[in-house]
């Protein structure tokens, strides 16, 4: 009995999550972004700085590893 109720609860939660994501996708597609200000530069992706820093750290650590093994 408890297992059936748990299974029904999980199914309801998954269904609600799917419907909510579909609702947000439809809502966002109906309201496109307003025309951007022509004087401002295009926005960069949010994770660009973080990814660039990770990339630099990764390259420098690989360089140090190769340098120390030689």
From Swiss-Prot:
Cellular component per GO, a single term: membrane
Record key words, sorted: Late protein, Membrane, Phosphoprotein, Transmembrane, Transmembrane helix, Virion
InterPro entries: Chordopox_A13L (IPR009236)
Annotated localization: Virion membrane
Virion surface side: 22-70
Variant or mutagenesis effect after changing residue 29 to A: No effect on phosphorylation
Composition-biased stretches (Pro residues): 33-45
Claim: Protein biosynthesis is one of the keywords in the record: no
Keyword Transmembrane helix recorded: yes
Outcome, altering residue 60 to A: No effect on phosphorylation
PTM comment text: Phosphorylated by a OPG054-independent mechanism.
Primary localization class, coarse: virion
Modification Phosphoserine occurs at: 40
Family: Belongs to the orthopoxvirus OPG139 family.
Record's function text: Essential for the encapsidation of DNA into immature virions (IV) and the subsequent maturation of IV into mature virions (MV).
Annotated protein name in UniProt: Virion membrane protein OPG139
Gene from which the chain derives: OPG139
């Amino acid at each position: 009995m408890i297992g059936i109720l748990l299974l029904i609860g999980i199914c309801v939660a998954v269904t609600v999550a799917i419907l909510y994501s579909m609702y947000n996708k439809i809502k966002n597609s109906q309201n496109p972004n307003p025309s951007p200000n022509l004087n401002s530069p295009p926005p960069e992706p949010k994770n660009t700085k973080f990814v660039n820093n990770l990339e630099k750290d990764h390259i420098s650590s690989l360089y140090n590893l190769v340098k120390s093994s030689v």
